[in-house]
């Protein structure tokens, strides 16, 4: 049975048992900042298990893509070296939310393994938690398994909990016995660490709630969470012990063998590469882009590790991206998102490979050099950090190399170096956090800026130089915290508001607004008078907010327009919304064509002309999802979110400020489109009067150009094309004339050559030629003279141009850069180039003749050395 058949068999079995087939969730956990990646099937059901979310079903079955690289669960450094460690795997799971419990869960699992998959019971081994007598009784008395293939284990192995407090419970595990030819004892024995017995299914029974004191209290509705690794189960079904021998990996290994022109399918580097293409492709399809932090950094590490192993196999050109196609052939049917994202995956990987190529070469040279001189077989932490910080060499890549060469890593030293850098970095970010902490003693700030741009308020806290104060005097800078404010704090790409706080006999200029928790920080300067804690003020936001609102609303229209023109896989990756412009970053593998840009711009302006009504509703994140609202991927939202709808065109979760109707945006104009990272494009645009000013300026430039070229705008492109074509023809003619001039001067110059021993030498100034002509003459003289050293000079627009050439048979004595350097120095300039050809320039024409005259003596001196 192959892996595709196993997936289908598993889902169909539980579907017949009234389980809802739930698609696997993204590798990026939604609304859960505690997890870097989805690492188990239960992750998407966590809130259901916790009782904070309800689903229309009580039984579920899923196949969940999982990652074990980065964060608490990290298998990266073991991948390729063992039979079962992977960065990416698929977890088969069935779940009960207060429906069936231990008896049915055990019965379903045993029936599926022994009756559906026909696994012999004598090859299976079962474990239970030592105090879970109920599960033990079900296995031994009801399922009637062999007591000799059963063991009790402690809390470490057979008791599961999500965290220190909350839902938890015992688990029972089913192992497969690969036979006595493989070392290792049964679970629970002293020899249990061997590879003979492999866990294939874990059944978790959530029946308790652990309180803060550690007490286990029974849950009102016990639940079941099970997980079974597809790769391990496939190995069992295909009669192999090593996961890399199953169909999933063999297909990729054969494709890699063809790509690298090698016959070795069991090479560790080959295994690393085929494992890594799976995790890399799924991460990119889920919207992760290589970067230097968070999930993007994990992705970058995995790509670079694969590239390094390709380098070990002699592959120095980009190759890793070419495994995308065979991966899609093997897994694209089960995961359609992979197929939709093929171009993005290939482009992102290829760009990262190219970018890392030079880094890898430099890093390996440095590491080789340093390791050769180490007094012990430990790589110092500061070297690991230097490679990481300066050359982008991930520590686990250095660890790979250390492992291969029998070195150990000084992780403690590396951690210290990282901590020093972290402390330096944190100092720059501490300002706002410190202020917020000290300001919070005055209470929270109520934001009223959605409804109004001015309001009355009370001062609840003042801060200056990182300290709370009672009074802020004239001309002093500081931070004012109010009990209510119309000022929008920087968030979601929208810049913080500016404006004024007015009070009796004075005013405070707000230059920026930031937010920490529920505290709004009005950062600025006292223009007049003084302000005390508890004073009353009138807070007024600057009218530039209207421009910000226009740009923010236009950003939403742009996002939806991009999705409609380029496809729904386009995802927002960042934005900046300020009064003068907007910037929007989004996932896309290649530059937009002029036609695509025009289509996007036209679609946005159509919505502006339609004057769509903007409506805002407050609802739960779950309700927003059902409504089809777009959300920032991986963003953590609170219990309630604001959903902005612009007619029936755009629906997004957003906490920013917006126009009431799209017509208030006025006009939308894209001014640039560029790449800002691998797989990420950036659009900058203008709205309203700024867009109109831009268009009018462009119109004026076109008018000026038309007048200059004496043609109308309709024929402007054709006229310019003709001018450029004429220019190209003239350049060709000029090049021919220069070549002819060089040839004509050749005989005259040869007559001025002097012999310095056996080296034919010429150092002379030419008139009315440029540097390119000098080079052409030098090349021709070298061919004619045999063994020669030549220096030619000219003065072009008051600046000396120098070219020196040396034939190869002179290089044992000196080269062209050495020959030209003293001449360039004498004329107040610099020079450089190759051993056989050098160029230079200078600013002192009065010294040129003497400098050239000294060339024969310089050569003679060199010949005597």
Swiss-Prot record:
Q: Which reaction does it catalyse?
A: tRNA(Ala) + L-alanine + ATP = L-alanyl-tRNA(Ala) + AMP + diphosphate
Annotated residues that bind Zn(2+) are located at 552, 556, 654, 658
Keyword Nucleotide-binding, does the record have it? Answer: yes
- Predominant location category: cytoplasm
List the GO terms this entry assigns under cellular component, sorted alphabetically.
Answer: cytosol
Per the record, the domain of life is: Bacteria
PROSITE patterns, per database record: AA_TRNA_LIGASE_II_ALA (PS50860)
GO annotations under biological process? alanyl-tRNA aminoacylation; negative regulation of DNA-templated transcription
Cofactor comment text:
Binds 1 zinc ion per subunit.
Copy the domain comment.
Consists of three domains; the N-terminal catalytic domain, the editing domain and the C-terminal C-Ala domain. The editing domain removes incorrectly charged amino acids, while the C-Ala domain, along with tRNA(Ala), serves as a bridge to cooperatively bring together the editing and aminoacylation centers thus stimulating deacylation of misacylated tRNAs.
* Matches recorded under NCBIfam families: alaS (TIGR00344)
The entry's family comment says:
Belongs to the class-II aminoacyl-tRNA synthetase family.
This chain's function reads: Catalyzes the attachment of alanine to tRNA(Ala) in a two-step reaction: alanine is first activated by ATP to form Ala-AMP and then transferred to the acceptor end of tRNA(Ala). Also edits incorrectly charged Ser-tRNA(Ala) and Gly-tRNA(Ala) via its editing domain.
User: What's the protein called, per UniProt?
Assistant: Alanine--tRNA ligase
Which species is this record about? Coxiella burnetii (strain RSA 331 / Henzerling II)
Lineage here is: Bacteria, Pseudomonadati, Pseudomonadota, Gammaproteobacteria, Legionellales
Name of the gene encoding the protein in the UniProt record: alaS
